[in-house]
Amino acid sequence: VDWVEKKNLPLSNRDYHSLQWLHYYLLQQGLIDQAASIFAIQQKDMAEGIKTRSNLRAGKYYYRMLAASFIETENWEIIDDFSPPNGWKPKSFSEAGYRFALGFSTAMQGKIEEANKHLLKLKAIRKKDFKKNYYKRIEYLKVWELEIQTAIKLYQNDFAAAIKLAKQ
């Protein structure tokens, strides 16, 4: 990240993939504040990139870092603090990842009706927008749907149904 600034290069030259993994590593180590500062870099770059249309790559990693932020800490409410910036127009896969993040987080908070809304949007994306040329990513969406459904069943104390969903 710093080398881009030192060489006065455009932010689109940043390696957001590595930034995402650094964020995840810090979360795994329990260094929550440091991880938050890394996520803040992505958030800032994403907002600026949308405004100037100069760096739309930063948005690709938004849902990944968002999901890691609450899954690794089990702080399900944190998602409310990280709405995407105005003007974010993700591709189908990133939109699906964002819907998973919202659906899973709300399910874990017991907001079942809201979780089901995100689940329906996720299913609609899978059925409408995905084609065979997305490699195996369609399976990701199916797994995300199952994870949300499992979280709902766990919250409802329907453990038999949750286990059945998890085994699919």
What residue ranges belong to the model's regions?
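Solenoid-like repeat scaffolds
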Residues: 2-10, 43-55, 82-93, 121-138, ...
